[in-house]
């Protein structure tokens, strides 16, 4: 079968290879991927900055964001059947009894990222217990489930932490960044009924700005405009230390700051003492979140369904670039205005 591969640690080793078709072991299923999403983690792996091949392999098959059809089931599988359309979660525990998305570094494997082959191939295998079934009406946008699940977990944590203290009812939100994660965060917050401001460095007539406005949100071009006021929930989705600093100054008293970016080493925060004093004196919370489990994948699918109905098929508009296995390189070539790129494994 054909698969999109890299040799982790070797920059620009991206290749389309012929590899052996996998077989499902006990408790596993064989998948026929339909679509695979491409994200910044793939870019880091291709550049040789991250990633690990499975034990005994030199190469790693990419693809951790996927929607797929079950085509074969292994012994002992009772939660999935042939023909089911599913989304597989990413992580698998490694000597860890915690929920897998809370396992510390070194105690998990990740499809298409760390120690497990991904789904950017004609076939893939995964453990059946980590599958989420996809309703027929959202199969076309289900490839967005994995990045959305990360958002769902972060916002869910914000709500749970906030409401554990008192009857906290957030009304306003600020989203820093309008990439896929920032836009999906805007979508969730608007579905929750929060007045939401989203900011990025694109002009007001850009597609990203239009997508924010279609959700009923307010867009601010941070290259020329200033954000004013404080917000009950602030979501940082840029991965920029400078933007973290800005967000700290916009958390309302009793508010929650959700960090979803992965940040480079180095950098400094201006007025850190003053900002942290404000966090303490105003009972603010800062929480980081990564990955997600079954629950948040299910929440993501429900919000995709609602967004399709309530916002005129809005999720589909995030997919701005499509490629297939014959021109796979295009999927892994990033341009300034791409939002979400999808690799179509099964051509319609």
Curated annotation (Swiss-Prot):
Record field: catalytic activity: D-glucose + NAD(+) = D-glucono-1,5-lactone + NADH + H(+); D-glucose + NADP(+) = D-glucono-1,5-lactone + NADPH + H(+)
GO MF assignments: D-glucose binding; glucose 1-dehydrogenase (NAD+) activity; glucose 1-dehydrogenase (NADP+) activity; NAD+ binding; NADP+ binding; zinc ion binding
CDD domains, alphabetized: glucose_DH
Binding site residues for Zn(2+): 39, 64-65, 146
Keywords, ordered alphabetically: Carbohydrate metabolism, Metal-binding, NAD, NADP, Nucleotide-binding, Oxidoreductase, Zinc
Needed cofactors: Zn(2+)
Protein residues bound to substrate: 41, 110, 146, 291
Record-listed NADP(+) binding positions: 178-181, 260-262, 289-291
Pfam families, per database record: ADH_N (PF08240), Glu_dehyd_C (PF16912)
EC number: 1.1.1.47
Domain of life assignment: Archaea
Keyword Nucleotide-binding among record annotations: yes
Database matches in InterPro entries: ADH-like_N, Glc_1-DH_arc, Glu_dehyd_C, GroES-like_sf, NAD(P)-bd_dom_sf
GO BP field: non-phosphorylated glucose catabolic process
HAMAP family on file: Glucose_DH
Family of this protein: Belongs to the zinc-containing alcohol dehydrogenase family. Glucose 1-dehydrogenase subfamily.
Protein purpose: Catalyzes the NAD(P)(+)-dependent oxidation of D-glucose to D-gluconate via gluconolactone. Can utilize both NAD(+) and NADP(+) as electron acceptor. Is involved in the degradation of glucose through a non-phosphorylative variant of the Entner-Doudoroff pathway.
Listed name of the protein: Glucose 1-dehydrogenase 2
Organism: Vulcanisaeta moutnovskia (strain 768-28)
Protein's gene: gdh2
């Amino acid at each position: 079968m054909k698969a999109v591969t890299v040799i982790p640690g070797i920059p620009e080793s991206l290749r389309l290879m012929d590899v052996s078709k996998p077989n499902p072991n006990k408790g596993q299923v064989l998948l026929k991927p339909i679509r695979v999403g491409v994200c910044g983690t793939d870019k880091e792996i291709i550049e040789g900055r991250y990633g690990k091949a499975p034990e005994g392999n030199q190469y790693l098959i990419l693809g951790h964001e996927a929607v797929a059809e079950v085509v074969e089931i292994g012994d002992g599988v009772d939660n999935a059947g042939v023909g089911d359309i599913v989304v597989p979660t990413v992580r698998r525990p490694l000597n860890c009894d915690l929920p897998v998305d809370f396992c510390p570094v070194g105690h998990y494997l990740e499809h298409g990222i760390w120690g497990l082959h991904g789904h950017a191939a004609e076939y893939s295998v995964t453990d059946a217990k980590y599958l989420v079934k996809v309703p027929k009406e959202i199969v076309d946008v289900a490839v967005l489930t994995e990045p959305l699940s990360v958002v769902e977990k972060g916002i869910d944590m914000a709500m749970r932490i906030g409401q554990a203290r008192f009857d906290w009812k957030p009304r306003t939100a600020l989203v820093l960044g309008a990439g896929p994660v920032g836009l999906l965060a805007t979508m969730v917050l608007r579905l929750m009924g929060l007045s939401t401001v989203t900011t990025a460095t694109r002009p007001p007539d850009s597609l990203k700005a239009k997508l924010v406005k279609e959700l009923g949100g307010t867009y601010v071009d941070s290259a020329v405009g200033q954000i004013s006021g404080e917000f009950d929930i602030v979501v940082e989705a840029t991965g920029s230390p400078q933007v973290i600093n800005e967000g700290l100054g916009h958390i309302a008293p009793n508010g929650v700051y959700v960090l979803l970016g992965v940040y480079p080493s180095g950098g400094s925060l201006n007025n850190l003492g003053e900002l942290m004093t404000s966090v303490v004196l105003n009972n603010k919370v800062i929480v980081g979140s990564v990955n997600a489990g079954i629950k948040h994948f299910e929440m993501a699918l429900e919000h995709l369904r609602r967004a399709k109905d309530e916002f005129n098929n809005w999720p589909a508009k995030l997919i701005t670039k499509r490629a297939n296995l014959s021109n796979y390189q295009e999927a892994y070539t990033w341009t300034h205005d791409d939002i979400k790129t999808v690799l179509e494994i099964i051509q319609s």
